């Protein structure tokens, strides 16, 4: 049953309604369904991180081959993000959000059944492509269904969901391990990702409609109003001003890449891309391999190392929630600066004192790393991208940032186990501490704050066809 009735006269009324409407249970439900992508992203990426020992043993993998398998998803995501962002602006948000999940389900099932490492590698590439296609569109959709005040906070909830997925993956592996799954442990774990993806796909097909902002730009007033009705469960009376419905004409950005780097958007694009890429480097090097780091800190007992992984990652949930709740008050940029500072400090302390101090102190520093990362750059890079561009450019902008950021993910995922095997934990941490230091310098220098800004009325800066 519809909760309220509104009257729409122009397309601008649609945007005004979205920007001014308080967050309701219906909006929260849509957010949870869309953020399901982030759960899948984190789960599918980290689940193999809990089973690197099994993969190495079953397939006789070298550290380099293991790195290739672990890097396959970020590599696939690089291309998926570019394509997903482009076609989300062209064909709509909902279609891409559905196609990507179907691809992810196929990839997860194939990966779980892989008889050889090369086949596993191929299906992980497909999974990465699907996640890459979905993620920027998910951030875009969240920004477009949230009111102006809550946009930054709602987009930043993704990091909370991410760490819930990471903790869940560790607990699921513990459960499956306790059930005696043996050598099939990693296969069952990966297959569960397909089950989760299927559930989210069904929820999206049932509850999700097209983004009202995209509809406003690409459909008639009547059609856009219908999408508004479906998303917010309201009744819309359409009383168009003269010529409003007939004035519809679909427009596209003439040269998206050039537009992203024009005088208006260049600093925004550089800032968002830099933060997203550098946070990917530091997280996928350290956070993704926490089960491996836990072996260094705690020992080789499977249950103990996984329990330690779950416990340490709770710091990520707390940090992500803190960052999301503080975004409106302090802005994305300031929280990013604070986060890079915390991450760099934690990595330097681990690098200097691992092996020379108490084990609990090193574990605390890893948790400190996750808290700073999830509340700062881990959260804010995606938010800055989603909030810095108007609807006509948002999909391409978030797609570009997400695509480039995957280079950072690939670097961290591929290089960490190799450096760790050759240099040990101390030198590896000190070397990788350069990443948050560079991020701190860039974020301090580029002074763009998107939180609370109205970017929808910037058509004069965008060349269209």
PLM segments and residue spans:
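Transmembrane-helix signature of 12-pass secondary carriers
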Residues: 2-465
């Amino acid at each position: 049953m519809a909760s309220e009735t509104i009257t729409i006269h122009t397309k601008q009324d649609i945007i005004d309604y979205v920007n001014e409407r308080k967050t309701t249970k219906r909006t929260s439900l849509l957010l949870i369904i869309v953020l399901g992508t982030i759960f899948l992203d984190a789960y599918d990426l980290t689940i193999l991180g809990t089973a690197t020992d099994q993969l190495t043993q079953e397939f006789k993998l070298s550290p380099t081959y293991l790195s290739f398998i672990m890097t396959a998803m970020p590599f696939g995501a690089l291309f998926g993000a570019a394509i997903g962002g482009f076609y989300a602006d062209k064909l709509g948000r909902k279609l891409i959000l559905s196609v990507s999940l179907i691809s992810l389900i196929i990839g997860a099932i194939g990966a779980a059944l892989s008889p050889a490492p090369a086949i596993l590698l191929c299906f992980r590439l497909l999974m990465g492509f699907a996640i890459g296609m979905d993620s920027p569109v998910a951030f875009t959709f969240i920004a477009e269904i949230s009111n102006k005040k809550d946009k930054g906070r709602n987009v930043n909830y993704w990091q909370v969901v991410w760490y819930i997925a990471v903790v869940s993956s560790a607990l699921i592996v513990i459960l499956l391990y306790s059930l005696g799954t043996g050598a099939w442990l990693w296969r069952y774990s990966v297959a569960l990702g397909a089950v989760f993806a299927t559930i989210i796909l069904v929820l999206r097909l049932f509850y999700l409609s097209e983004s009202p902002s995209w509809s406003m730009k690409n459909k008639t007033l009547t059609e856009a109003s219908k999408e508004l009705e479906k998303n917010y469960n309201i009744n819309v009376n359409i009383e168009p001003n003269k010529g409003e419905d007939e004035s519809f004409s679909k427009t596209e950005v003439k040269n998206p890449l050039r537009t992203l780097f024009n005088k208006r958007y260049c600093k925004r694009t550089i800032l968002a891309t830099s933060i997203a890429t550098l946070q990917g480097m530091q997280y996928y090097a350290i956070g993704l391999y926490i089960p491996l780091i836990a072996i260094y800190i705690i020992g080789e007992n499977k249950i103990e190392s996984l329990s330690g992984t779950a416990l340490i990652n709770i710091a990520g949930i707390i940090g992500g929630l803190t960052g999301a709740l503080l975004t409106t008050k302090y802005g994305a940029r300031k929280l990013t600066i604070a986060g890079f500072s915390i991450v760099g400090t934690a990595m330097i302390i681990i690098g200097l004192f691992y092996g020379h101090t108490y084990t609990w102190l090193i574990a605390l520093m890893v948790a400190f790393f996750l808290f700073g990362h999830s509340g700062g750059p881990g959260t804010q890079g995606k938010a800055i991208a989603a909030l810095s561009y108007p609807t006509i450019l948002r999909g391409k902008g978030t797609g570009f940032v997400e695509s480039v950021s995957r280079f950072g993910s690939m670097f961290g995922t591929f290089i960490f186990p190799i450096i760790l095997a050759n240099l040990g934990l101390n030198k590896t941490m000190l070397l990788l501490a350069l990443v948050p230091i560079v991020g701190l310098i860039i974020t301090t220098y580029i002074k763009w704050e998107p939180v609370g800004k109205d970017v929808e009325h910037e058509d004069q800066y965008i060349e269209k066809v």
